[in-house]
């Protein structure tokens, strides 16, 4: 059944033109440039796909943020996934782009080419079935994502415990949006003075998670939907706040996001996970309290603890010419990178921003090559 009739109002050209004109009219009254970070990679792709940059006035700029979980995953964690796949009688499972990102050993897809058992999942729940089908194998799920996907990992874990599936383990790489944004805003080089907050994350955690950012940094934050009309409406809301010298949290994406979020999903996560003291982010370094880990009561499912002796905890250097770090901080754009669309392409990605379908470089490569 087609859902075009539901989506089309949010892509209507006439509505976009009206919003664009309203943005330009109000933006002309701004006292200083408005630099908006769209935190989520989904927003970045919509902005590029629908040519929204071309509708913006010159005194309004988008800075692309760290809201792509694969992009910010450090090489050390990628190497651990490869090391787990290298163990005897192991099966490593992960979703989509995580399989394609190269660490210092290569990617999990390349591991498959060497005879290691690394598999794509379409749903985290498949991990339960694979573990049941392979009782004599060590099945390890590489769990990754922001607050959006964490409840699914929690559900799989809780079901594994309930069903007494003892050969399924979890390498937890679930990260949190607010601490990463806070780290960027603390940087003295940061020019960002407004935020488009992620919507899918907010469906789970609620808009409430951004309140501390508003209070601390005194900047407007709008939780925006992904469609072009959503984004332009959100930009208009940000401009109005800037003109009124306001700094508050507002929800544009009211058809899906509430202030409290999905409390049932939050309860699932809280039942088995807790905040880590530190976690390394690619391009951002170590950020305190920015990621989750399994609670001690689930230690027997924790791949980092069970297979500690097999993990090297090595670190490896990034390609010095790659500007992924600056792009993730909103300081640089993909077109500023000398590797972009030459050495670094989706077929031969050098940096994580090109590997992931949500990465800023992948979006520019697909929609805005010059």
Can you name each region flagged by the protein language model?
Residues 2-136, 150, 154, 158-163, ...:
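Metallocofactor- and cofactor-centric catalytic cores in central/energy metabolism, strongly enriched
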Residues 140-142:
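Internal active-site segments that recognize and position negatively charged phosphoryl groups
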Residues 171, 191-258:
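A conserved active-site cap/scaffold subdomain adjacent to cofactor or substrate pockets
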Residues 174-181, 261-264:
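Short, conserved secondary-structure transition motifs
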Residues 233-326:
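Internal helical hairpin/lid segments
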């Amino acid at each position: 059944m087609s859902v075009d009739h539901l989506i089309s109002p949010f892509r209507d050209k006439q509505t976009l033109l009206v919003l664009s004109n309203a943005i330009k009219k109000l933006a002309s009254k701004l006292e200083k440039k408005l630099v908006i970070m769209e935190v989520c990679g989904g927003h970045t792709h919509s902005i590029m796909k629908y040519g929204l940059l071309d509708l913006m006035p010159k005194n309004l700029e988008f800075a692309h943020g760290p809201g792509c979980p694969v992009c910010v995953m450090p090489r050390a964690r990628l190497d651990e996934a490869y090391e787990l796949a290298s163990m005897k009688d192991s099966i490593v499972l992960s979703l989509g782009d995580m399989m394609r990102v190269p660490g210092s050993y290569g990617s999990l897809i390349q591991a498959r080419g060497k005879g290691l058992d690394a598999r794509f999942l379409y749903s985290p729940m498949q991990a339960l079935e694979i573990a049941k089908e392979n009782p004599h194998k060590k099945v390890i799920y590489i769990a990754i994502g922001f607050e959006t996907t964490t409840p699914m990992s929690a559900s799989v874990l809780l079901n594994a415990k309930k069903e007494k599936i003892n050969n399924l383990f979890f390498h937890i790489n679930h990260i949190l949006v607010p601490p990463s944004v806070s780290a960027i805003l603390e940087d003295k080089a940061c020019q960002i003075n407004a935020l488009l907050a992620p919507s899918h994350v907010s469906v789970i955690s609620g808009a409430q998670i951004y309140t501390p950012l508003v209070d601390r940094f005194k900047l407007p934050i709008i939780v925006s939907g992904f469609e072009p009309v959503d984004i332009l409406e959100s930009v208009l809301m940000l401009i109005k706040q800037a003109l009124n010298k306001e700094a508050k949290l507002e929800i544009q994406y009211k058809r899906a996001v509430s202030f409290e979020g999905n409390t049932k999903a939050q309860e699932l996560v809280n039942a088995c996970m807790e905040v880590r003291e530190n976690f390394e982010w690619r391009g951002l370094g170590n950020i305190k309290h920015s990621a989750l880990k399994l609670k001690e009561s689930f230690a027997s499912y924790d791949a980092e603890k069970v297979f500690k002796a097999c993990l090297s905890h090595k670190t490896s250097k990034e390609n010095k010419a790659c500007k992924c770090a600056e792009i993730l901080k909103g300081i640089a754009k993909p077109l500023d990178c000398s590797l972009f669309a030459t050495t670094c392409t989706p077929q031969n990605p050098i940096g994580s921003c090109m590997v992931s379908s949500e990465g800023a470089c992948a979006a520019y490569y697909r929609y805005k090559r010059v």
